[in-house]
Amino acid sequence: AWMLEARNKKSLALDLSKPEGQAVLHRLAAQADVFITNYPPQVRAKLGITYDHLAPQNERLIYASFTGYGEKGEEANKPGFDSNAYWARSGLMDLVRADEHTTPARSVAGMGDHPCAMAFYGAIVTALYKRERTGKGSHVSSNLMANGVWAASVLAQAKLVGAKFLPRRTRENALNAVTNHYQCKDERWLILSLLNEDRQWPTLAKCLGREDLITDPRFATKKDRHARSLEL
């Protein structure tokens, strides 16, 4: 992880609980382009490293703060972690379940860190572009939970406008046999995603060595195939 994330970085350890450490950080921020922190707002205030503390010393400073749950609200000062704030609280942990009876799945270590970093990067670069136009720095932020919700935004925004969802089904009871995943003879897994089913169905049948299915009246149309999904 260090080799991937920290190329060309230099490190400096500061004890920000002491005035001497804070003074060094303030001197660095006074000549920096971007200051990045993942401390919650309350901790920043205690250490004297909020935007209001640092910006007066450097009007061109881009102050970028990243948190678990955002800059404001009841949860602003809660510590956040990839597996809880990004994965669980956003609803992603539930959305990947096959059905309501399936045990929720854990996320891969750091699963949300990279997409969150890209969103954060976008905020910082936008602020730098703004500074090129105005000469002024600014405060930008992002958080784990917001990025998790964004990852699930197709469903989240649908729910916000009153959409109704079909009950989720396990792969063994799928509504559509040609949009599903299967274990092959060599124990590897294959996932099918026929986005234009009417056009792609004959090709799939040929690839499977089952051209007879193309003319089988039970599976002649998309409606027929869905009605007999388990049989297919």
Q: Where on the chain are the PLM-derived regions?
A:
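Short, cationic motifs built from Arg/Lys/His that form the positively charged side of catalytic pockets
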Residues: 9, 28, 40, 55, ...
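Short glycine/proline-rich turn/loop motifs
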Residues: 8-13, 101-106, 232
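Generic alpha-helical structural signal
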Residues: 6, 26, 122-125, 202, ...
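Structural signal for conserved beta-strand scaffold positions within catalytic alpha/beta enzyme cores
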Residues: 4-6, 13, 65, 94, ...
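A structured beta-alpha segment of the ubiquitous adenosine-cofactor-binding alpha/beta core
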Residues: 1-56
